[in-house]
C-alpha cells in the first residue's frame, strides 16, 4: 500500500470515527425540546452547566445532572441546586426517563400534569409546588418511589393507585391535602412505607389494613377518625398522634374481609386456614341472624303504622308525611348511584331525602347495584344552592331589562330569516336593532325544551345567567317571556365569532395573527376558569366551540351560551361535531374535564385553521383531533400543521408550547386532562 493510499485510509477512518461519535451522541429531538422548555421554565439557571434554552445535545455534551442511554435521556438528578420557577409542560415527552429528582429546590407552580410514564423514581420533595398530585402518576406501572412531601400540594387525592404494584414508598407529608384516603390504596400490595403526616386528611385509614408488606406508617397530625386497624399495630413503625380517633373497642371487620396475619410465618398451614374459614362462617352466621331479626322488627314496626311501604302514595301520588326511617335531627339522607329515585323526595320537619347520582364514592355502606346511604347535615343543602334548581323562592332578575315581545319583534323585523344570525341546539339567534342605534343578539329558546308545568323555570335561568360577570363573557342585557315565547337578549358583537374568522373564505375573516390567537385562547380559558372555579356552585358549560366564542372590536374573546347546560340534557342533537369528549356519549355525561377537551379542540382550530370535523377532506383527516393528535409531539410535522394563513409569521417555540398544551387538553382519559386553571397559567407564559 502506497503512502498516498495509507494517508487516504487514515483520513477516512478518522472521519468515520468522528461521524460515528456525533451520530451516537445526538440526543432525541423531543428530549432536547423538553429539557429546553424545563430550562426556560426554571428561569435559565446558570447553575445547570451545559443546559440551554434552545437546541444543544444533552447526551453528547453531558449536561449537568443528565444521564442518557443511547440518544434518550433516562435520568434527571438536580437535587439541591437552588432552582426556581417551574418544570414546564414538556417533561412528558421524555419517553425513556426513569429517574427524576428535583428535590430540595425552590420550584413552584403546579407539577407537570403529564409526567413520563416509565418513571420508577420520582422525588419532588422540599419545594413550593402547589396544586395536586398529577393523575399521570396512575400510568407509572413501574414506579417504586414517590416523594412529594414538604410542598404546598392541596385538594383531594384522586383514586389513582389501582395499577402501581411496584410502589414501595409514598411520602406526601407536610402538604395541605384534604379528603379521604383513596380506596385504591388497598391495591398497593408492594407498599412498605407511607408518610402522610402534617396534612388535613379525614375519614378512616381502613384502606391500609390489609397491605401485606407495610411496615412504616406515619399519619400523625391529620383529621382521621374511626379506629386504628389492629393489623397496623404490629408493624415496625406506626405514628398516629394528632388525630380524632374513636375510643373503645374497634368493631369487627365485615364478613369476608381479607385478613393479613402479620405474625404468621407465611406458610399458611391447614389449621390456620380452617380457623379463618371457621371465623368467617361464624361471623357470617351471626350477621345473618342480626339482619333477619332487624327485618322482622322493621316489618313489625311497619304493620303497626299507617304508612305504606313506599316513599309515595301509589294511589294519590302524594308524599308521605313520615320518612321510611328517621335519622337524627337536622340531617339529610342521601341516596347515591340510584337513578330510579332521581326525582323522589320525602319531606319531614327534621329530615329531608335527596336523591342524586354520586360524583365521588363516599359510601359508608354499599351494596352491588344498590343505592348507597349517607347521613349529611341538612345545613349543607342550603350552603350549596343549585343554579338549575327551581325552588319556590322568586328569582332575582333585577340586574337585567325585561323587554316586551312587541319591542323585540319590531327591532328584529318579526324575526325574519334575514335577521337570523345562527341556529343551535337550544334555539335561534336573531339580530335586533333599535331606533337609537343599539344592537342586540336575541336568542329564542326552543319552547319544547322548557317544561310547561314549571312557568318559573325560565325566570330562574335568567336570574342565574344575570349573576355571571366576567370581561371574557358575553353579557346578558335582558330577557322576554310572553305568549309562551322565551328569549334572552345579549350584547351584539359586529366582529362575529371565532368560527367566522377561522373558517369563512373571504379575506376579511382571516386577519388573526399568531399573538392574537394566543390572546383569544387565553381569554377564553379565563372565562371557562371563571365558570369552573369562581362560580358557586361551579358550572359546566357543555357547549364550548368556536361559534360560541364571540370577538369584540379589538378581537377580545367573549364566551357565550353559558348557563344553559341544563337544556343540553333535553336535546338529542349533537352538541357540536368534533368537539365532544370521548366519554360524552350523551349530554348528561359532561364534566369540567369535558369542557377542557372541547376547549382543546378550539385551540386546535386556532393552531391549524381547520374545522373540528370536515367531511370534505380525506377520511384520515376528517376528524381534526384524530388527525392532529399524533403529530403534536413531532417537531418535524408540527410546522406543516400550522394554519397556512399565518404565512409562517410565528415563533416556532411558541407554536411548540401551544401544541403541548393542546395535547394534554385532548387526552382520551378525562383524568389526564388538566384543570383549566393550569391551562390559563401555561398560556400566560406565551403572551
From Swiss-Prot:
Residues 346-365, 378-394 have a biased composition (Polar residues). Residues 239-269, 310-329, 344-365, 378-398 are annotated as: Disordered. Gene3D superfamilies: Phosphorylase Kinase, domain 1 (3.30.200.20), Ribonuclease Inhibitor (3.80.10.10), Transferase(Phosphotransferase) domain 1 (1.10.510.10). Disruption phenotype: Plants show a reduction in leaf size, but no apparent defect in pollen development or fertility. GO terms for cellular component: membrane. Pfam families: LRR_1, LRRNT_2, PK_Tyr_Ser-Thr. SUPFAM superfamilies: L domain-like, Protein kinase-like (PK-like). One of its GO terms (molecular function) is ATP binding. PROSITE patterns: PROTEIN_KINASE_DOM. Expressed in seedlings, roots, stems, leaves, flowers and siliques. Residues 415-686 form the Protein kinase domain. It is found in: Membrane. Residues 300-687 are cytoplasmic. Residues 26-278 are extracellular. The keyword Iron-sulfur does not apply. Glycans are attached at residues 187, 263. LRR repeats lie at residues 96-118, 119-140, 142-165, 166-189, 190-212, 213-235. Keywords: ATP-binding, Glycoprotein, Leucine-rich repeat, Membrane, Nucleotide-binding, Receptor, Repeat, Signal, Transmembrane, Transmembrane helix. It comes from the Eukaryota. The chain crosses the membrane at residues 279-299. ATP binds at residues 421-429, 443. Cannot functionally replace STRUBBELIG. The protein kinase domain is predicted to be catalytically inactive. This is Protein STRUBBELIG-RECEPTOR FAMILY 4.
Amino acid at each position: 500500500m502506497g503512502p498516498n493510499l495509507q494517508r487516504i485510509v487514515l483520513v477516512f477512518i478518522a472521519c468515520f470515527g468522528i461521524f460515528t461519535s456525533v451520530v451516537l451522541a445526538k440526543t432525541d429531538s423531543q428530549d432536547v425540546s423538553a429539557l429546553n422548555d424545563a430550562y426556560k421554565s426554571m428561569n435559565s439557571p446558570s447553575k445547570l452547566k451545559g443546559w440551554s434554552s434552545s437546541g444543544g445535545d444533552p447526551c453528547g455534551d453531558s449536561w449537568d445532572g443528565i444521564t442518557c442511554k443511547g440518544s434518550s435521556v433516562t435520568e434527571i438528578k438536580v437535587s439541591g441546586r437552588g432552582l426556581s420557577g417551574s418544570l414546564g409542560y414538556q417533561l412528558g415527552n421524555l419517553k425513556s426517563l426513569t429517574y427524576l429528582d428535583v428535590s430540595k429546590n425552590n420550584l413552584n407552580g403546579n407539577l407537570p400534569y403529564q409526567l413520563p410514564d416509565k418513571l420508577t423514581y420520582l422525588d419532588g420533595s422540599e419545594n413550593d409546588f402547589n396544586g395536586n398530585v398529577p393523575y399521570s402518576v396512575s400510568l407509572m406501572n413501574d414506579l417504586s418511589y414517590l416523594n412529594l412531601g414538604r410542598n404546598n400540594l392541596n385538594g383531594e387525592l384522586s383514586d389513582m393507585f389501582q395499577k402501581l404494584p411496584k410502589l414501595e414508598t409514598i411520602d406526601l407529608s407536610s402538604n395541605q391535602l384534604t379528603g379521604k384516603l383513596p380506596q385504591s390504596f388497598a391495591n398497593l400490595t408492594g407498599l412498605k412505607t407511607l408518610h402522610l403526616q402534617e396534612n388535613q386528611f379525614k375519614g378512616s385509614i381502613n384502606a391500609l389494613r390489609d397491605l401485606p408488606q407495610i411496615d412504616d406508617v406515619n399519619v400523625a397530625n391529620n383529621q382521621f377518625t374511626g379506629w386504628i386497624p389492629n393489623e397496623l399495630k404490629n408493624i415496625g413503625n406506626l405514628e398516629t398522634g394528632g388525630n380524632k380517633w374513636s375510643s373503645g373497642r374497634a368493631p369487627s371487620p365485615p364478613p369476608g374481609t381479607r385478613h393479613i396475619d402479620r405474625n404468621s410465618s407465611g406458610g399458611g398451614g391447614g389449621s390456620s386456614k380452617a380457623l379463618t374459614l371457621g371465623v368467617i362462617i361464624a361471623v357470617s352466621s351471626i350477621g345473618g341472624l342480626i339482619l333477619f331479626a332487624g327485618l322482622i322488627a322493621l316489618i313489625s314496626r311497619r304493620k303497626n303504622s299507617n304508612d305504606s311501604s313506599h316513599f309515595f302514595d301509589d294511589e294519590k301520588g302524594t308524599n308521605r308525611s313520615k320518612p321510611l326511617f328517621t335519622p337524627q335531627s337536622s340531617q339529610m339522607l342521601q341516596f347515591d348511584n340510584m337513578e330510579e329515585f332521581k326525582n323522589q323526595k320525602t319531606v319531614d320537619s327534621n329530615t329531608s331525602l335527596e336523591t342524586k347520582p354520586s360524583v365521588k364514592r363516599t359510601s359508608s355502606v354499599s351494596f352491588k347495584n344498590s343505592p348507597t346511604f349517607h347521613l349529611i347535615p341538612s345545613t349543607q343543602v342550603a350552603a350549596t344552592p343549585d343554579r338549575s334548581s327551581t325552588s319556590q323562592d322568586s328569582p332575582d332578575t333585577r340586574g337585567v331589562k325585561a323587554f316586551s315581545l312587541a319591542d323585540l319583534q319590531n327591532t328584529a323585523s318579526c324575526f325574519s330569516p334575514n335577521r337570523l344570525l345562527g341556529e343551535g341546539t337550544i334555539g335561534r339567534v336573531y339580530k335586533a336593532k333599535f331606533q337609537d342605534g343599539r344592537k342586540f343578539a336575541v336568542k329564542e329558546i326552543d319552547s319544547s325544551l322548557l317544561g310547561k308545568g314549571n312557568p318559573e323555570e325560565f325566570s330562574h335561568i335568567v336570574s342565574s345567567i344575570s349573576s355571571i360577570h366576567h370581561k371574557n363573557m358575553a353579557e346578558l342585557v335582558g330577557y322576554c317571556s310572553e305568549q309562551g315565547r322565551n328569549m334572552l337578549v345579549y350584547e351584539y358583537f359586529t366582529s362575529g365569532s371565532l368560527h367566522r374568522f377561522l373558517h369563512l373564505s373571504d379575506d376579511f375573516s382571516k386577519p388573526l395573527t399568531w399573538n392574537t390567537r394566543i390572546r383569544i385562547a387565553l381569554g377564553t380559558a379565563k372565562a371557562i376558569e371563571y365558570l369552573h372555579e369562581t362560580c358557586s356552585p361551579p358550572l359546566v358549560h357543555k357547549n364550548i366551540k368556536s361559534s360560541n366564542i364571540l370577538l369584540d372590536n379589538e378581537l377580545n374573546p367573549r364566551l357565550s351560551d353559558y348557563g344553559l347546560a341544563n337544556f343540553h340534557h333535553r336535546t338529542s342533537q349533537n352538541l357540536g361535531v368534533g368537539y365532544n369528549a370521548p366519554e360524552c356519549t350523551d349530554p348528561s355525561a359532561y364534566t369540567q374535564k369535558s369542557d377542557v377537551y372541547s376547549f382543546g379542540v378550539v385551540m386546535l382550530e386556532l393552531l391549524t385553521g381547520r374545522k373540528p370535523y370536515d367531511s370534505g377532506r380525506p377520511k384520515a383527516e376528517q376528524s381534526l383531533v384524530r388527525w392532529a393528535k399524533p403529530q403534536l409531539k413531532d417537531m418535524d410535522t408540527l410546522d406543516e400543521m400550522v394554519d397556512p394563513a399565518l404565512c409562517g409569521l410565528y415563533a416556532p417555540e411558541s407554536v411548540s408550547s401551544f401544541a403541548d398544551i393542546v395535547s394534554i387538553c385532548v387526552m382520551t382519559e378525562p383524568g389526564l386532562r388538566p384543570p383549566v386553571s393550569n391551562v390559563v397559567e401555561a398560556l400566560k407564559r406565551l403572551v
